[in-house]
Amino acid sequence: MLKNITVTASRGVARKTPIAMSDVDRREVENKLGNNELPEMLNQTPGVYATKNSGAYGDSKLNMRGFQSSNVAVMVNGVPVNDMEHGGLYWSNWGGLGEMVRYMQTQRGLGASKVSVPSVGGTVNIVTKTTDSKRGGYATYGVGNDGFNHLTVSVSTGLTKSGWNFSMLFGKKWGDGYIQGTNFSDYDYFFAVSKRLGQHHQIALTGFGSPQSHYQRNQYDGLSVEGWQDVKRFMGGKSVYRYNPTYGFGKNGERKSSAFNFYHKPQFSLNHIWLIDDKSSLNTALYMSIGHGYGNSGQGINSAYANSWYGAANGKLRYDFRHADGTFAYDQVQELNEQSDAGSKMV
């Protein structure tokens, strides 16, 4: 008779499997995650280097053995999540994984793949929770610097007399971001439903996702050493590296930044477990991952304003549309478009 859902996978065992690997368990994630992003949990793992990159929410970068993410295979429950075209990875698509992780495992070294990512640098496998056999729940609320807020609610029915088991988790993160004008909002959800079918069969449906939106500091707005020193006068004693060249306010006082991203990429899996006899079982899994989203940034319509949306050029701050306090003059852009007889000059 089936008692619980058992998830099986090809997982290395520390000190036994003859490969260079490291594990991060659930307890370590709970103790150290805080308001960090999930890749940063691997910073203490040998051969792994993670950084917030541009500083905006979900824009983390992960390197393994010196190789970029396009040469590092990342999987969630054994399913590859790297981009099929260029091999990169957008961690903002998986912003809520920190609350759903059961364990993470890194395997350093060469791997082979016919599709997606040739894992020259190594492999990262993130395994999420399944249905919880214990009845109960919890709620947490955390705060951090730069207006960071994190709310999580989780509940599980445990195994009912009728053979059902429900586990659910909902969460939300929001804040202003460390970099100017990189405010973000992230909703997280996870569910797992299982049902016993007689003495020998059990099915389970699991799904999770993190619809998120966040503003970014444009990758083309990097400043030189002299450029960073130039913006020091705008920061009021704060770190110059928090400066965002395209951060500013519209005519109605609304906060703006030229780069914005929204995406939602949920993953669902349907598992069937058949206990054939005392020594044999058959596990079948079907998974689906879909996604939709968009990103936008400013664009000049004609050559006169082709580069005006960029806050910097050649490592130096641009002053085409710039207020005396260093903020980008979105109000001036709006006025320029309103006064034009031939349509908007900058969109």
Regions found by a protein language model. Give the residues of each.
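Acidic/polar loop-and-plug regions of large Gram-negative outer-membrane beta-barrel proteins
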Residues: 194, 202-271, 296-346
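Short acidic/polar hinge/loop motifs at secondary-structure boundaries
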Residues: 61, 80-108, 127-129
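N-terminal periplasmic "start-of-domain" segments of outer-membrane beta-barrel proteins
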Residues: 3-33, 61
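Extracytoplasmic beta-strand/coil segments of soluble accessory domains associated
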Residues: 39-80, 102
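Structural signature of outer-membrane beta-barrel domains
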Residues: 12, 69, 81, 144-146, ...
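Transmembrane beta-barrel architecture of outer-membrane proteins
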Residues: 33, 37, 59, 119-121, ...
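Transmembrane beta-barrel wall of Gram-negative outer-membrane proteins
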Residues: 136, 143-174, 179-218, 267-277
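Non-catalytic regulatory/gating segments with a bias toward low-complexity or hydrophobic composition
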Residues: 42, 103-105, 124-126, 284
